[in-house]
């Protein structure tokens, strides 16, 4: 095999440079950058007991319209409802 034939094989199997650059640009655009969030430092003695949701689950009405309809349908179909 001559040296020009070997060069042709190398050139034909090489990935075009533009394809590599385009791929890199796509990968960089794939992820969205988010700004850094600054959190306030806690003061000494600040309580760790922070309530982030309501603890009064028992205060909710257990006899909502939905639960009444569900119990009625269960009774109609022969199920025992407490």
UniProtKB/Swiss-Prot annotation:
InterPro entries assigned to the protein according to its UniProt record, in alphabetical order: DSS1_SEM1
Main location, first listed in the record: nucleus
Protein species of origin: Caenorhabditis elegans
Its job: Subunit of the 26S proteasome which plays a role in ubiquitin-dependent proteolysis. Has an essential role in oogenesis and larval growth. Required for intestinal function and default lifespan.
GO cellular component: cytoplasm; nucleus; proteasome complex; proteasome regulatory particle, lid subcomplex
UniProt subunit comment: Part of the 26S proteasome.
Keywords, in A-Z order: Cytoplasm, Developmental protein, Nucleus, Proteasome
Bias kind Basic and acidic residues: ranges: 63-76
An individual GO BP term: positive regulation of growth
Residue ranges, annotated region (Disordered): 56-82
Tissue spec: Expressed in intestinal epithelium and head neurons.
Recorded family membership: Belongs to the DSS1/SEM1 family.
Subcellular location: Nucleus; Cytoplasm
Gene knockout outcome: Embryonic lethality, growth defects, larval arrest, reduced lifespan, and sterility.
Pfam families linked to this entry: DSS1_SEM1 (PF05160)
Designated gene of the protein: dss-1
Iron found in the keyword field: no
Superkingdom: Eukaryota
Protein name: Probable 26S proteasome complex subunit dss-1
UniProt lineage: Eukaryota, Metazoa, Ecdysozoa, Nematoda, Chromadorea
């Amino acid at each position: 095999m001559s040296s020009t034939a070997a060069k042709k094989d190398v050139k034909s199997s090489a990935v075009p440079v533009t394809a590599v650059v385009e791929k890199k640009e796509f990968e960089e655009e794939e992820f969205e950058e988010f700004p850094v969030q600054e959190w306030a430092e806690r003061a000494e003695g600040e309580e760790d007991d922070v309530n982030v949701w309501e603890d009064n689950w028992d205060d909710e009405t257990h006899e909502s319209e939905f639960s009444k309809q569900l119990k009625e349908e269960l009774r109609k179909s022969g199920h025992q409802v407490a």
